[in-house]
Curated annotation (Swiss-Prot):
Pfam families: Sdh5 (PF03937). InterPro entries: SDH (IPR005631), SDH_sf (IPR036714), SDHAF2 (IPR028882). HAMAP family: SDHAF2. Plays an essential role in the assembly of succinate dehydrogenase (SDH), an enzyme complex (also referred to as respiratory complex II) that is a component of both the tricarboxylic acid (TCA) cycle and the mitochondrial electron transport chain, and which couples the oxidation of succinate to fumarate with the reduction of ubiquinone (coenzyme Q) to ubiquinol. Required for flavinylation (covalent attachment of FAD) of the flavoprotein subunit of the SDH catalytic dimer. GO terms for cellular component: mitochondrial matrix; mitochondrion. It is found in: Mitochondrion matrix. This is Succinate dehydrogenase assembly factor 2-A, mitochondrial. GO terms for biological process: copper ion homeostasis; mitochondrial electron transport, succinate to ubiquinone; mitochondrial respiratory chain complex II assembly; protein-FAD linkage; tricarboxylic acid cycle. Belongs to the SDHAF2 family. This protein may be expected to contain an N-terminal transit peptide but none has been predicted. Keywords: Chaperone, Mitochondrion.
Length: 157
């Protein structure tokens, strides 16, 4: 992190403060040489390891449900925030321990939130490992047969 900060500072000086490029006010035409170790490459590759979601085997059921309510509301994309928060508000309180564990695996085991959205809306086929009773319940919830307006997340109770 510190190396990245130093690299950013050096690049900013070279671009935005040309009077500080050289020593004692002399401007050099070349940017400062950067060590190859400071270059950060960020890319999507098939060989990148995905982080594993930590299992919480001894977590009490009520604490787990509270965590899942929070995680359903804070997905990082509005579509899933609305779908999952309304789903959790409607169904999560009545889930038993097994159903809660399945829902936990569904929203935290998938590495890409767009996959959850596409599976729930039947745009893509749901893989067998996630095609559970909870996913079927989520798909029914997404169909919104009651025509409930979902413009905002439900209030916390």
């Amino acid at each position: 992190m510190l190396r990245q900060l130093n690299l950013t500072r050096e690049i900013s000086r070279w671009i935005f403060m040309p009077w500080q490029r050289g020593a004692a006010g002399t401007a050099s035409a070349e940017p400062p040489a950067l060590p190859i170790n400071d270059v950060i490459v960020d890319y999507d590759g098939p060989d990148l390891p995905l982080p594993e979601y930590p299992q919480r085997p001894n977590e009490p059921l009520e604490i787990r449900k509270q965590r899942l309510v929070y995680q359903s509301r804070k997905r990082g994309m509005l579509e899933n925030d609305l779908l999952l928060s309304t789903f959790a508000a409607k169904y999560l309180k009545n889930f038993n321990e097994e159903q809660t564990a399945i829902y936990d695996q569904l929203i935290n085991g998938v590495s890409n939130d767009w996959d959850i959205y596409y599976w729930a809306t039947d745009v893509k086929t749901t893989p067998a490992e996630y095609n559970t009773e909870i996913m079927q319940l989520l798909k029914e919830h997404v169909k919104n047969t009651e025509r409930v307006q979902r413009f905002r997340q439900p209030d916390l109770t």
